Amino acid sequence: MPRPIGNLETTTDSGTGSAAFLFQPAHLVPFVQAWTWQRLWQERLLKGADSGGDPPPEAVWLLQHPPCYTLGRGASEDHLLFDPEHPPAPLHRIDRGGEVTHHAPGQLVIYPVLDLHRHRTDLHWYLRQLEQVVIDVLAALGLRGERIEGLTGVWLDQCKVAAIGVGCRRWITQHGVALNVNCALEGFESVVPCGLAGRAVGCLSDWCPGLHVSEVQPLVCDALAARFGLCLEPNADAAIAEGRCW
């Protein structure tokens, strides 16, 4: 199967070179820890907007979680096929849209904390751009990703490979995309993924055997930079990523 080769050539219809730190932890990051990082950065952007000074950089995290489940703000526990008091992995109700999803190693999670005032203050546009990022990545792998009318996410051959759910406060985003690269899918059998009964879930490695997250990450960076007009600056400083210093 085709493999990642070089940079994507895509046309951005958003900002013009907005600065953004890129954090790519090499270790598995517990969900609550990553959620805390996003909220701290969101607060930083909000305070920067209120101060009237130079705007702080935006931020993007690309990482993997240990097994867990997350429920969106209004998600129904009817879509859990287990007792929520005794989940098979940690269960979190969080401040994003959407229903229940599963996270696990081998799934690349993309968390952009962006100020949509620098791009476009339109959540429908933002969700479609996140879908397009995934579609661009799949195209670089020689795969044809598809949308389904009325739903959010990206599918391959009717199998959902990317779930999308976001939170937004005063146009500052958090949460984002969960892209199944080479994760085990058994955890999805304990829920109705995204509340969509009867729809299959897949991994990119089903179409590209041997594919690893490390091969997909640079493609995601290229697509994010192109679609959102970001100047991504890799930053390995854990203190900055975790909000302990700026």
Swiss-Prot record:
<dbReference type="InterPro" id="IPR004143">
    <property type="entry name" value="BPL_LPL_catalytic"/>
</dbReference>
<comment type="similarity">
    <text>Belongs to the LipB family.</text>
</comment>
<dbReference type="GO" id="GO:0033819">
    <property type="term" value="F:lipoyl(octanoyl) transferase activity"/>
</dbReference>
<dbReference type="Pfam" id="PF21948">
    <property type="entry name" value="LplA-B_cat"/>
</dbReference>
<dbReference type="InterPro" id="IPR020605">
    <property type="entry name" value="Octanoyltransferase_CS"/>
</dbReference>
<comment type="pathway">
    <text>Protein modification; protein lipoylation via endogenous pathway; protein N(6)-(lipoyl)lysine from octanoyl-[acyl-carrier-protein]: step 1/2.</text>
</comment>
<feature type="binding site">
    <location>
        <begin position="96"/>
        <end position="103"/>
    </location>
    <ligand>
        <name>substrate</name>
    </ligand>
</feature>
<protein>
    <recommendedName>
        <fullName>Octanoyltransferase</fullName>
        <ecNumber>2.3.1.181</ecNumber>
    </recommendedName>
</protein>
<comment type="function">
    <text>Catalyzes the transfer of endogenously produced octanoic acid from octanoyl-acyl-carrier-protein onto the lipoyl domains of lipoate-dependent enzymes. Lipoyl-ACP can also act as a substrate although octanoyl-ACP is likely to be the physiological substrate.</text>
</comment>
<keyword id="KW-0963">Cytoplasm</keyword>
<feature type="binding site">
    <location>
        <begin position="163"/>
        <end position="165"/>
    </location>
    <ligand>
        <name>substrate</name>
    </ligand>
</feature>
<keyword id="KW-0808">Transferase</keyword>
<dbReference type="InterPro" id="IPR045864">
    <property type="entry name" value="aa-tRNA-synth_II/BPL/LPL"/>
</dbReference>
<feature type="domain" description="BPL/LPL catalytic">
    <location>
        <begin position="54"/>
        <end position="240"/>
    </location>
</feature>
<feature type="active site" description="Acyl-thioester intermediate">
    <location>
        <position position="194"/>
    </location>
</feature>
<feature type="binding site">
    <location>
        <begin position="176"/>
        <end position="178"/>
    </location>
    <ligand>
        <name>substrate</name>
    </ligand>
</feature>
<keyword id="KW-0012">Acyltransferase</keyword>
<dbReference type="GO" id="GO:0036211">
    <property type="term" value="P:protein modification process"/>
</dbReference>
<dbReference type="InterPro" id="IPR000544">
    <property type="entry name" value="Octanoyltransferase"/>
</dbReference>
<dbReference type="GO" id="GO:0005737">
    <property type="term" value="C:cytoplasm"/>
</dbReference>
<feature type="site" description="Lowers pKa of active site Cys">
    <location>
        <position position="160"/>
    </location>
</feature>
